Amino acid sequence: MTQYDRVAIFDVDGTLMDIDHRRKYVQSDKKDWKSFFEYMEFDTIRDDVFHLAHALHKDGYVIIVCSGRNERHRKITEKQLAFGKLKPQALLMRADDDYRPDYEVKAEMLKTMRDSGFNPKIAVDDRPSVVKMWRDEGLTCFDVGGWSE
């Protein structure tokens, strides 16, 4: 099996996409996930992070997008990535019935990648628990901030 070592992982919400307009729905003790996802279509791209993804791709990195979004949001996610002219090697998303914490879902995605011959070296994320997981797994992780836990 071919081993891909030049792999970079990018998160979507808060990383590739600016979600400041809808973050308010999940920052209190009573989280309103329905509204949080309902306003996803109004997200805007983060030029700085898209630029980084394009630069890494131009330098020979395989780009894989790992999102905590559910599969039911795949079409809008693909549309948002296309708007930013990003064509990842893969877009990994959680199952619609998966309610585990993001860091658990993404750790499983990482295991799947490694089992498939991909050995990511870089991750870009905004959620502290996920940033910690990437780093614990040996990846260099760029924390683009914005999320508090």
Where are these regions (language model features)?
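Short, aromatic/basic amphipathic alpha-helical patches
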Residues: 77-84, 113, 133-138
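Short loop-to-alpha-helix "cap/lid" segments that border enzyme active sites
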Residues: 101-113
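Alpha-helical substrate-recognition element adjacent to the catalytic core
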Residues: 2-100
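Acidic, Mg2+-coordinating phosphoryl-transfer loop and its flanking beta/alpha structural elements
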Residues: 110, 118-149
